[in-house]
């Protein structure tokens, strides 16, 4: 009488089993399929357009550009943001579903760039309107730098906890479009007063009524008035 022989477990079985958590699985799925909304207002956006070509091929990162904010979870702001465009940018961000991310591309988006010294209508940094996850400096940044920024964002997504991110955004978001403009006497002669123009940023001089805590949904009209 032949005895019943049970098949031995394959040694490769342990390599084919994946153990993870729901949070890690959610992060992996989101970082592998980012759908960006392209918000370009100046020359920096031309550098991002070169990523669509075959030389850089940003499709390999799972990026699918969308034309509607309701279908996007990433917005790339490139170029100068003016006071008149500020409500539109905030409205686009509010229409994006959670979780959503922001990459500030270029010097004009991050700090106002060369227009921040003598322009009354330039927003001194897009982070005064919406929260920024990755800052990408440059004038303009190279396509390789854009890929590096997307890679850093993917690493950030892989380590985050969704509940903590939503709580942090609702408690720490502040908005303001009121910026002080001080014009020096020699600003049009090429002799800039560095101590006068480049002052350290401080929020203590800004009246508290210009800031709005993001504890509830705030309309775009309330953010700029």
Curated annotation (Swiss-Prot):
Transmembrane segments: none annotated. The keyword Chloroplast applies. Gene3D superfamilies: 3.40.50.12280. It is found in: Plastid, Chloroplast thylakoid membrane. Its EC number is 7.1.1.-. Keywords: 4Fe-4S, Chloroplast, Iron, Iron-sulfur, Membrane, Metal-binding, NAD, NADP, Plastid, Plastoquinone, Quinone, Thylakoid, Translocase, Transport. SUPFAM superfamilies: HydA/Nqo6-like. It comes from the Eukaryota. It is a peripheral membrane protein. NDH is composed of at least 16 different subunits, 5 of which are encoded in the nucleus. This is NAD(P)H-quinone oxidoreductase subunit K, chloroplastic. It comes from Daucus carota. The gene is ndhK.
């Amino acid at each position: 009488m032949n005895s019943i022989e049970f098949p031995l477990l394959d040694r490769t079985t342990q390599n084919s089993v994946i153990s993870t958590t729901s949070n890690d699985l959610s992060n992996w799925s989101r970082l592998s399929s980012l759908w960006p909304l392209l918000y370009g207002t100046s020359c920096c956006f031309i550098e991002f357009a070169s990523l669509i070509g075959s030389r850089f091929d940003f499709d390999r990162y799972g990026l699918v550009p969308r034309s509607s904010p309701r279908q996007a979870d990433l917005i790339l702001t490139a170029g100068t943001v003016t006071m008149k465009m500020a409500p539109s940018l905030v409205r686009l961000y509010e229409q994006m579903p959670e979780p959503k991310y922001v990459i500030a591309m270029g010097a004009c988006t991050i700090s106002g760039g060369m227009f921040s010294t003598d322009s009354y209508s330039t927003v001194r940094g897009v982070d005064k309107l919406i929260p920024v996850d990755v800052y990408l400096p440059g004038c303009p940044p190279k396509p390789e730098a854009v890929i590096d920024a997307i890679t850093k964002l993917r690493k950030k997504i892989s380590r985050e906890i969704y509940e903590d991110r939503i709580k942090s955004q609702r408690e720490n978001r502040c908005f303001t479009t009121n910026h002080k403009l001080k014009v020096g006497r020699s600003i049009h002669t090429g002799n800039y007063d560095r101590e006068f123009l480049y002052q350290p940023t401080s929020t203590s001089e800004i009246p508290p009524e210009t800031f709005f805590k993001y504890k509830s949904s705030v309309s775009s009209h309330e953010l700029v008035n």
